[in-house]
Amino acid sequence: MISGYTALYGLIAHPAQHSLSPFIHNTGFHQIQMDARYAVFDSQATPAAITSAIKTLGIRGVNLSMPYKQSLVPLVDNLTSTAKLVGAINTIKNEAGRLTATNTDGDGFWCALQKAHPQRRYRSVTILGAGGAALAVIEAAVRYGVQQVTVFKRANATYDSVIQRLAQISLASGLQIIVEPYDDQLALATALQNADCLINATNIGMTATPGNPLPINLLQYLPEDSLVADLIYAPRETAFLKTAQKAHYQIQNGLGMLIEQAALSFEFWTNESMATMPIYQHLTGGNDAS
């Protein structure tokens, strides 16, 4: 039962109605018997109005998605080192009106991969795309044994700023980061030959933006024991993953990343762990973390 003592958490984004986050977090609150509820706030308010509302309404913590992951960065009181390097936030904790923000996307991705494929090691990784989610995955990669990342980035308005941010991540972590033009198929074929993992971090393959981010003929250059991952979780099997599976590669969709980043946000707010296996089982119809 919701009362005046119930702590409020939520997702702030637009659009947001489709989100699985309320199910995940409310399951977590039930697990630890915490008097709290997680709601969805589909908002197009200004960033300043968002931070003001969090403080004024006493919302204990929020997740952020588009369009707020970058625009709220300068408006919070504290940033974790991860958030500073990535330049984007997905989690805010409100402690008596003081907002501390972090980014759990990258660690969420690698945690999901570890759970689904515990014996695998990833020294060299190729990533398609260099948006906020990709930067988070790259920033976290070194903590999971990755030594080199090759990023394929379109030459658009964000190119220079992304290059600068990747240089900062490399300097801070020691991770070797190579950036290539997205449409350079020779460079892509070369990178794939040495990749333990190929990741799609573009929006190509989402329900609203169907397609395949990789020319099908290039997949042959990827070693047969490599893993192919997609950050997209809707649909669960993108054209990219279907192509990889047909070529007998192990695959990983973005659902695990969604669950694990949520669990890390939950811990950031509550200092309690979320049991993720029941959530995996519910959302996959009884299957495990893979």
UniProtKB/Swiss-Prot annotation:
Disulfide bonds: none annotated. The active site is at K69. NADP(+) binds at G129, A130, G131, G132, A133, L231, G254. Keywords: Amino-acid biosynthesis, Aromatic amino acid biosynthesis, NADP, Oxidoreductase. PANTHER family: BIFUNCTIONAL 3-DEHYDROQUINATE DEHYDRATASE_SHIKIMATE DEHYDROGENASE, CHLOROPLASTIC (PTHR21089:SF1), SHIKIMATE DEHYDROGENASE (PTHR21089). Belongs to the shikimate dehydrogenase family. This is Shikimate dehydrogenase (NADP(+)). It comes from Latilactobacillus sakei subsp. sakei (strain 23K) (Lactobacillus sakei subsp. sakei). The lineage of its organism: Bacteria, Bacillati, Bacillota, Bacilli, Lactobacillales.
